[in-house]
Amino acid sequence: MTVAEAIREYVDETEGLELYEQEPEKGLGILVKGDNSYMETIMNLTRYFDDHNVDDVNMELEGMYVECQGDDTIVYFPELEAQL
């Protein structure tokens, strides 16, 4: 499983998260809704990678950054392409 596939599966399995791909120039994003913690999301995503033997050998998580949009937060992975 690739890093991008793992992120997509994790988001599909986790309540309060959505994929955010409306700004493809920023890369693949995770929309963390409302009262959910983006830091907790990142920690749980890391645990998900460990549990599913996903290794970031190509450094695709490099440059990850966060933007706030109202009550929501978007975690961007600029090295991963958004799919439109």
Please name every model-derived segment:
Residues 19-84:
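Acidic, low-complexity, intrinsically disordered interaction modules
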